[in-house]
């Protein structure tokens, strides 16, 4: 099986002008895809920038994949989770110790809905590939 795409994961969706410079460097190194790691914070505070960054990547010929990163701390990441702050009773519980953990429980409808809404908003309101 041959490698069809070369990608770089990209964090920090705040400023389009910085992203463009980074994307140009990615292209110089042979990358054709950028994976945008999108956090809860990005969705809440930087959402208007996300699609502008997607468009700038497309203008440079890059394929764009959205990666919901650190959402509820369920999907990794050290970012602050607004879901966890607002839903303290919907956290994972250790099967061994009963300790409440600092990660959302995917078995709760509230977290599933929260995560699905983020994914749907990215699919509906951006031009990610």
Descriptions of predicted regions:
Residues 2-9, 15-20, 61:
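Substrate-binding groove of N-acetylhexosamine-processing glycoside hydrolases
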